[in-house]
Amino acid sequence: MAGDQKAKAKMEQAKGKAKAAAGRAVGNERMAAEGQAEKSKGDARQAKEKTKDVFKH
């Protein structure tokens, strides 16, 4: 289960980074902001999983 969450975090980070870059490239501030928000969500999920791993071991 934790592996699924880690993969989901990486996917959110990559998707958000790509969306933010695309938004900046076309001058769409809303798309860039949404992409950054998705990346941040992935960052938060990854931090949560790392914290869980610390207490697991």
Curated annotation (Swiss-Prot):
InterPro entries: CsbD (IPR008462), YjbJ_sf (IPR036629). Residues 1-57 are annotated as: Disordered. It comes from the Bacteria. Residues 1-15, 36-57 have a biased composition (Basic and acidic residues). Belongs to the UPF0337 (CsbD) family. This is UPF0337 protein SAV_1088. It comes from Streptomyces avermitilis (strain ATCC 31267 / DSM 46492 / JCM 5070 / NBRC 14893 / NCIMB 12804 / NRRL 8165 / MA-4680).
